[in-house]
Amino acid sequence: MATNSVRLEVITPSKLFYRGEVELVIVTTLDGDEGFMAGHVWACKLLDVGELWIQEKGAAKNEWRVDAVSRGFIDVKDSIVIYTDAVEWSEDIDMDRVLSEKAKAEDWLVKHPDADEDSAEMQNAKLILAKAEIRKNVADGGHRH
């Protein structure tokens, strides 16, 4: 008998963030937004900083849990496991902290206009800006394309 749900686990280095039965998971991979559900072909994909949309088993078609997720990877087999450095629910995002981190990164970029694009500092500033934008979007309810 076919099932319309699959087990999802979201794991960070410090904790099991989420475990539950879901109907659909949408993540931002390096190839763009991708959705995974029960019966999906096996896959292992790298994740980019982005939004994680979770439609839990039995939820209404337009009812989603949304969180901000950092880089990592998703492993899709008989279950779906997401490994990531950081993840947080929309309701847990501290906007003061987000805006402060964003301002610091923007300030660094202004003070270092000639920095090498490949330098660790430049890559870190760009990553902080990307995370801040995603966290802001998620706090506002998410912006799925």
Question: Which residue stretches match the model-derived regions?
Answer:
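Short, charged, intrinsically disordered terminal tails
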Residues: 1-5, 143-145
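Compact, glycine-rich, soluble single-domain proteins
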Residues: 7-9, 13-100, 104
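Acidic/glycine-rich phosphate/pyrophosphate-binding loops and surrounding catalytic core
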Residues: 87-145
